[in-house]
Amino acid sequence: MIKNRKKKSYTSVYALGQYISMSAHKARRVIDQIRGRSYEEALMILELMPYRGCYPIFKLVYSAAANASHNKGFKETNLVISKAEVNQGNTVKKLKPRARGRSFPIKRSTCHITIVVEDISFYQQYEEYLRYLKNPGCSNENRNLTCYDTYSSGGPWDKK
């Protein structure tokens, strides 16, 4: 059996909540609203949504940001929720006593929630570095030249 090993990422941090007493379907309804949003925007959305599942997800997003700032020194203003997934957990089965000595089964579903946040400031610096590598001597003023501008600028091809 071949296992895919996770590559070590220098820009992402995660928080994992296991055995949260909520159905996976109800948690996904909340998670879909915050996926891809910035950290501050996600906290505002979670505070204002009227669902019971918002509070554990709010705590996980807050924990992921705390992990990012403490463990890797990221700023919270640059964090974006890059990945948020909900997996189904165990089902806790109980018996509810009823009348005349009978009992009814109760199934309590749980879920596992993973929140991954990334620091986007590294991507912006990386894009600037790639632009510099493509045109190291070219400044911003020379990038908007057309073919006609290069030939009619008084170079050797402009002479008759």
UniProtKB/Swiss-Prot annotation:
Subcellular location, record wording: Plastid, Chloroplast
Segment forming the signal sequence: none
GO MF annotation: an example: structural constituent of ribosome
Family: Belongs to the universal ribosomal protein uL22 family.
Oligomer status and interactors: Part of the 50S ribosomal subunit.
Record function comment: This protein binds specifically to 23S rRNA. The globular domain of the protein is located near the polypeptide exit tunnel on the outside of the subunit, while an extended beta-hairpin is found that lines the wall of the exit tunnel in the center of the 70S ribosome.
Cited NCBIfam families: rplV_bact
Protein name (database record): Large ribosomal subunit protein uL22c
Gene from which the chain derives: rpl22
